[in-house]
Amino acid sequence: MAAVAGSGAAAAPSSLLLVVGSEFGSPGLLTYVLEELERGIRSWDVDPGVCNLDEQLKVFVSRHSATFSSIVKGQRSLHHRGDNLETLVLLNPSDKSLYDELRNLLLDPASHKLLVLAGPCLEETGELLLQTGGFSPHHFLQVLKDREIRDILATTPPPVQPPILTITCPTFGDWAQLAPAVPGLQGALRLQLRLNPPAQLPNSEGLCEFLEYVAESLEPPSPFELLEPPTSGGFLRLGRPCCYIFPGGLGDAAFFAVNGFTVLVNGGSNPKSSFWKLVRHLDRVDAVLVTHPGADSLPGLNSLLRRKLAERSEVAAGGGSWDDRLRRLISPNLGVVFFNACEAASRLARGEDEAELALSLLAQLGITPLPLSRGPVPAKPTVLFEKMGVGRLDMYVLHPPSAGAERTLASVCALLVWHPAGPGEKVVRVLFPGCTPPACLLDGLVRLQHLRFLREPVVTPQDLEGPGRAESKESVGSRDSSKREGLLATHPRPGQERPGVARKEPARAEAPRKTEKEAKTPRELKKDPKPSVSRTQPREVRRAASSVPNLKKTNAQAAPKPRKAPSTSHSGFPPVANGPRSPPSLRCGEASPPSAACGSPASQLVATPSLELGPIPAGEEKALELPLAASSIPRPRTPSPESHRSPAEGSERLSLSPLRGGEAGPDASPTVTTPTVTTPSLPAEVGSPHSTEVDESLSVSFEQVLPPSAPTSEAGLSLPLRGPRARRSASPHDVDLCLVSPCEFEHRKAVPMAPAPASPGSSNDSSARSQERAGGLGAEETPPTSVSESLPTLSDSDPVPLAPGAADSDEDTEGFGVPRHDPLPDPLKVPPPLPDPSSICMVDPEMLPPKTARQTENVSRTRKPLARPNSRAAAPKATPVAAAKTKGLAGGDRASRPLSARSEPSEKGGRAPLSRKSSTPKTATRGPSGSASSRPGVSATPPKSPVYLDLAYLPSGSSAHLVDEEFFQRVRALCYVISGQDQRKEEGMRAVLDALLASKQHWDRDLQVTLIPTFDSVAMHTWYAETHARHQALGITVLGSNSMVSMQDDAFPACKVEF
């Protein structure tokens, strides 16, 4: 991905390399950059007899060639090679392009060389901002000490006179500390290094012409040029919980979405917003969260705000064709903005204060930012979104403390928690710490330890509702909440419905027994449909004894065929108001898949349905994907009165859920179906007629990184977190045109230290590979089944035999094709099971000997299928539960099925989901008879007990180096994201990675952990090479930083994680 080679020809006696960093978001930086370029050129004391610099600069202006990189979008190279001078000007380069050109310059035999580093740089450290990441003295020394360069120089005869390399760089920040290190490098490099010498040459006509030309090339682009409109129309619909992780340069940028609500977190340091190619396909971004103000987090967001203002001006001015204007005016509407307005913590030298700029732009747009701070104990979340039958999105603020001066200066640390309506779907927990110091972050988490959903690796609403159902006093509340979600409660009483009551997961009124049934059914059914079906029937008979209507419903669910019928022909049935009931079966797979989909051996994957990591034979995966693809796009739901008023009524939390005409979230946007571009290594599902919504069905968040699969990884082997199902492909409306092609971690060939254990992705040019995948029109050359055949993954809830039916019912779950406020459904519509008689209680397997515990688990699991026939009834991998659990990696927590806590709600902080160590409680101890499930407060949470998350960013900025072993002991996530390619992060990278390894080996849960870096680093490569052998034993997968997402006819760097 190197740009046009700028030097390296022995014929040229002199070489000039000018590097200008990232594009400018503001005109004020242009003057500063031109001054730096002039200072650098005039400081070059090249002998006029050898090179007439004034004349050569004039020749450059008239004869140079301009090249736009086809691999690094936005990078330009101005190059000219004459008899006396070879000149290369790199504009807006990536870090890899800069490294390549620096190597070329160092190896160039020219006797006189000049390197000028100019561009936007941080005031505090002097770090130069590039298109991707930054360039600091630390990075520069890494290049000078590169082993490859030294080896090449050692094999060439030494020159009579050592070449002279003049370096002009910022004179402040950490660059001032570079001078002492320079003398020690001269001998090994056979160079005379001169750092920031004073001006030697006078101003000249040639220099003026050169600077004028460069100024024209550096003219800040208009908002429409910086953030280009898409080439094709259509809105993107994200129906399942997911998180897009973008390369944020010096900072971070992420996009979290659930069905009906989207959140943009920070904007990254690049004015050419890394998230733009995704959000331009959305009609609305419901919330924007800025964790901290600064040059590392706001430039990308400010570019979006500038474009929105430019669109307003365009509309006011009129002119142009309607079609053209419509194509350009496509930025999404913005909802609430969370931003602790204050002076930027970091800013660019001679640049604008990004925080002040953001406030100004928001004011012009009529948006008032809302500050965030931690409230009093007990912590109460801010309800961002809540909709009956869909779910609730809460935001907990862990930092900063309540109002005060400290609040305005500190970074925000926010925990987003998605509570789905379906009792069997997975509760999703995602942490965005910003620059919060780990100590403050952990202090904030201590205040949340009473929350049951943080005590288990995988939690579902039914786990949380179990205890409450045993209490008769809560029957009214549970009935109300169930009604509000459109569920048919065990004892429905319309007159007592209170739509405003805070949503409680659908099976609140059911007995603990239901929890067990539902928790077990999905995974067991999936493993062995036949046994599970046969066992479920007796279970259903018991339910029938309690209620005739329920008997009918459950009978329909008990058999795979009956279950399939209602789902496929749901359109003929009355509107399904008890959405949560069918959702579990339909969406259970998508809820549980989360984070763990990173790689674990096939044998272990079978036992980790909760994390949906289990690979299956290619043929089997195809059977699942193709049928599902034909009927799986959720239909936009029409607004329902209940959904609109529920957040406000009866809820003690502050509700910020926007009320949009016709629908909440992207659901309301009309979507245009367009062809999908298939990238190599995507599962067979991509080839299906309706696989345009690949982003949902093929989320390639994680990649299985198994050393033996090197060939496959070359092709972009990817492993989706959830089973590759195209549940919603049936509808032509909600189209998610996104193909994800994650890249495995790889080593650069230039680094000889990475031999055999080198990262799975063995390609040298990661960006080149990414570009190949991005342009994936040649997918046919690489059979889509390559991924399926090598490492296909099935979510624990992916129904194989009844795939089509499952897809349909899932569609019902998502949209039901009817307004959520429709009347209660026909009693035959799969209502939640009745509570078990009070005399029945579950035996806690953890209190039994391992063998007995496994038997109990198997039995209860196999019965449970009836409760959720729609999604699991046909799953083939059910029986070998005990055996699967004993297989490492996913066995521990993954094996603790997402729906694992059958009778023990996650509130039992003490109940570890049955894992291969099922006989040993992981966090707290419960009573043997399961009575704890009827006593919510029985288990006390230890003072510093760990919290479990699905995805967590590691603190960045000044707090990056403070992340230690204790942090990983207390914050246990299935996915960790390392972002912020700044100097501090690079210097402290090894210590953080070692802390993860040291901490992971002491976890009492055998969890599969995926590490997702947003940038490439030498420290990461070195660590990977030295510790790779331990990764599989510890259950750690490291992804590459060059994952690509292909959407319609475009691609952009990002890693998508689906939960």
Swiss-Prot record:
<dbReference type="GO" id="GO:0005829">
    <property type="term" value="C:cytosol"/>
</dbReference>
<keyword id="KW-0597">Phosphoprotein</keyword>
<dbReference type="GO" id="GO:0031114">
    <property type="term" value="P:regulation of microtubule depolymerization"/>
</dbReference>
<protein>
    <recommendedName>
        <fullName>Microtubule-associated protein 1S</fullName>
    </recommendedName>
</protein>
<feature type="compositionally biased region" description="Basic and acidic residues">
    <location>
        <begin position="466"/>
        <end position="486"/>
    </location>
</feature>
<dbReference type="GO" id="GO:0006915">
    <property type="term" value="P:apoptotic process"/>
</dbReference>
<dbReference type="GO" id="GO:0007409">
    <property type="term" value="P:axonogenesis"/>
</dbReference>
<dbReference type="GO" id="GO:0005819">
    <property type="term" value="C:spindle"/>
</dbReference>
<feature type="compositionally biased region" description="Polar residues">
    <location>
        <begin position="783"/>
        <end position="796"/>
    </location>
</feature>
<dbReference type="InterPro" id="IPR026074">
    <property type="entry name" value="MAP1"/>
</dbReference>
<feature type="modified residue" description="Phosphoserine">
    <location>
        <position position="657"/>
    </location>
</feature>
<dbReference type="GO" id="GO:0007399">
    <property type="term" value="P:nervous system development"/>
</dbReference>
<feature type="region of interest" description="Necessary for interaction with RASSF1 isoform A and isoform C">
    <location>
        <begin position="666"/>
        <end position="1059"/>
    </location>
</feature>
<dbReference type="GO" id="GO:0042802">
    <property type="term" value="F:identical protein binding"/>
</dbReference>
<dbReference type="GO" id="GO:0003677">
    <property type="term" value="F:DNA binding"/>
</dbReference>
<dbReference type="GO" id="GO:0015631">
    <property type="term" value="F:tubulin binding"/>
</dbReference>
<feature type="modified residue" description="Phosphoserine">
    <location>
        <position position="472"/>
    </location>
</feature>
<dbReference type="GO" id="GO:0006914">
    <property type="term" value="P:autophagy"/>
</dbReference>
<dbReference type="GO" id="GO:0007052">
    <property type="term" value="P:mitotic spindle organization"/>
</dbReference>
<dbReference type="InterPro" id="IPR056617">
    <property type="entry name" value="MAP1B/S_N"/>
</dbReference>
<feature type="modified residue" description="Phosphoserine">
    <location>
        <position position="582"/>
    </location>
</feature>
<dbReference type="GO" id="GO:0003779">
    <property type="term" value="F:actin binding"/>
</dbReference>
<feature type="modified residue" description="Phosphoserine">
    <location>
        <position position="731"/>
    </location>
</feature>
<comment type="function">
    <text>Microtubule-associated protein that mediates aggregation of mitochondria resulting in cell death and genomic destruction (MAGD). Plays a role in anchoring the microtubule organizing center to the centrosomes. Binds to DNA. Plays a role in apoptosis. Involved in the formation of microtubule bundles.</text>
</comment>
<keyword id="KW-0493">Microtubule</keyword>
<feature type="region of interest" description="Necessary for association with actin">
    <location>
        <begin position="960"/>
        <end position="1059"/>
    </location>
</feature>
<dbReference type="GO" id="GO:0048812">
    <property type="term" value="P:neuron projection morphogenesis"/>
</dbReference>
<feature type="compositionally biased region" description="Low complexity">
    <location>
        <begin position="759"/>
        <end position="769"/>
    </location>
</feature>
<dbReference type="GO" id="GO:0051310">
    <property type="term" value="P:metaphase chromosome alignment"/>
</dbReference>
<dbReference type="GO" id="GO:0051015">
    <property type="term" value="F:actin filament binding"/>
</dbReference>
<feature type="compositionally biased region" description="Low complexity">
    <location>
        <begin position="873"/>
        <end position="887"/>
    </location>
</feature>
<feature type="modified residue" description="Phosphoserine">
    <location>
        <position position="759"/>
    </location>
</feature>
<dbReference type="GO" id="GO:0048471">
    <property type="term" value="C:perinuclear region of cytoplasm"/>
</dbReference>
<feature type="modified residue" description="Phosphoserine">
    <location>
        <position position="655"/>
    </location>
</feature>
<dbReference type="GO" id="GO:0005813">
    <property type="term" value="C:centrosome"/>
</dbReference>
<feature type="region of interest" description="Necessary for the mitochondrial aggregation and genome destruction">
    <location>
        <begin position="967"/>
        <end position="991"/>
    </location>
</feature>
<keyword id="KW-0238">DNA-binding</keyword>
<dbReference type="GO" id="GO:0016358">
    <property type="term" value="P:dendrite development"/>
</dbReference>
<dbReference type="GO" id="GO:0005874">
    <property type="term" value="C:microtubule"/>
</dbReference>
<dbReference type="GO" id="GO:0005730">
    <property type="term" value="C:nucleolus"/>
</dbReference>
<comment type="similarity">
    <text>Belongs to the MAP1 family.</text>
</comment>
<feature type="modified residue" description="Phosphothreonine">
    <location>
        <position position="638"/>
    </location>
</feature>
